Amino acid sequence: MPGRQTVIARDSRYLDLATTLLQRMRLTSAAGGVWEAADVQWWSRAARSTDRDGQVFWLDEAGEPAAAVIVTDFGDTTQLDVLVGPAADADADDAWALALNRAEALRRRGAAIELPLPADSTAGARILTGAGYQPTGEDVIASWLDAARTPQVTTLAAGYRLHNRADTHDRSHPLVPRNGAGVAARLARCSLYRPELDLWVESPDGEVAGYGLFWPDPVTRVGLVEPMRTEDQHQRRGIARHILTSGLARLAAAGCTRLKVSSDIGLYLGAGFKPAIAAAIYAPPA
């Protein structure tokens, strides 16, 4: 059996390792950490400048991911996530040291660095403040809902129709305008993506009025909502509420017991989600 090792992973290997690590972390802590496995799969919907460098993982003696530093270029900001799984204390210091080094290198190239620090990471807070990092005042919100409390599916406005990607795969994906022509293929390679839970609403004139993507994780039984959008000309007609309640019902039917969204806007609070601060955003010294 090999000893512990460090690897650089890209593409499908990266997604597989990140998914396994985040699932292990969620199974260890029901409300700890920041992200779900589905989050990193959603982030892979488009090519990013940080893809070419790969992502660093520490593997345990069994070859399973124990810790990682994930760097994601979101355009305006570059986000660094330090993921430390259960029983990975031996790798934590190395992960934090690498994260700080990569952040400094990216900052020198002009990147605006953000580092979400989990609310339960006292060691991380000590390391970041010791390196001169400070909270920006912005937080990552995690809003949770027990699947048993899923609200009733609302009625869709007259003339509008709800579809899913499985039934409309011959049509351009609703996410193409904001995420590029390759988004459907990129989503299809994600292990947690389900086309029947990729919902969109068609307007009376045949256009996309809104959409929502719902991610069931059969390992953690957490269902993630990401993204949700109603186009401007179709606002205030109950479209988002219908997509949300339809998607939540389908997540529950898929076996999810807890539902999550990284937002605390009224749409989600009205559906029963309870928000909490999952992480504070830290930035490096100027």
Protein language model annotation of sequence segments:
Residues 3-20, 161-173:
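A short beta-loop-alpha structural element at the N-terminal edge
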Residues 10-12, 23-107, 204, 209-232:
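Conserved donor-binding loop and adjoining core beta-sheet/short helix segment
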Residues 38-40, 149-223:
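Flexible, substrate/cofactor-facing loop regions flanked by secondary structure
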Residues 67, 136-139, 209-210, 277:
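A structural microfeature
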Residues 72-77, 82-158, 279-285:
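Acyl-donor-binding surface of acyltransferase catalytic domains
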Residues 89-104, 230, 236-249, 253, ...:
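Conserved acetyl-CoA-binding loop-helix of GNAT-fold acetyltransferases
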Residues 113-116, 225, 258-263:
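Conserved hydrophobic beta-strand within the GNAT/NAT acetyltransferase core sheet
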Residues 124, 128, 268-274:
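Conserved active-site tyrosine of GNAT-family acetyltransferases
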